[in-house]
C-alpha cells in the first residue's frame, strides 16, 4: 500500500520546510528500527497550486502503518519535529491518500 501526505506550506517557508524534511525519515529509522519500511520520499509540487509538499511511503498493510504511526507518535523526538514543522504549515494535511 502506498501512503501520501500532502501539506500546504506557508508562503516564505518552503526553504525551511525543505531543510526539515530530511529529518523525518532519519528519525523514523531511529524509532522504528527494523520496522522502518523506507524509503520515505519528499516531493515539492512544481505544477498546479504553489506551496505544496508531499511525503510518500509504502507499507504492507494499513495495520502495519498504524502500528508504525503509534510508535512515532509516542516518541518525543518525533513530536518535536512535528511541532517545529507545524509552524511553517497552513494546514496540517490537506489530503491523505492511500493506494492499495
Q: Language-model segments: what does each one mean?
A:
Residues 5, 17, 55, 65:
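Hydrophobic pocket/interface hotspot
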Residues 6, 35-54, 76-100:
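Glycine-rich beta-strand-turn "strand-cap" elements at beta-sheet edges
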Residues 13-39, 73-82:
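Short amphipathic alpha-helical segments
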Residues 15, 60-73:
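Short amphipathic alpha-helices within nucleic acid-binding modules
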Amino acid at each position: 500500500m502506498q501512503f501520501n501526505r500532502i501539506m500546504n506550506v506557508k508562503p516564505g517557508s518552503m526553504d525551511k520546510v525543505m531543510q526539515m524534511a530530511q529529518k523525518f525519515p532519519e528519525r523514523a529509522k531511529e524509532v522504528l528500527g527494523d520496522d522502518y519500511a523506507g524509503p520515505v520520499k519528499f516531493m515539492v509540487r512544481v505544477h498546479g497550486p504553489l506551496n505544496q509538499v508531499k511525503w510518500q511511503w509504502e507499507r504492507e498493510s494499513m495495520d502495519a502503518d498504524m502500528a508504525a504511526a503509534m510508535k512515532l507518535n509516542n516518541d518525543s523526538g518525533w513530536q518535536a519535529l512535528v511541532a517545529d514543522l507545524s509552524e511553517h504549515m497552513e494546514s496540517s494535511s490537506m489530503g491523505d491518500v492511500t493506494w492499495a
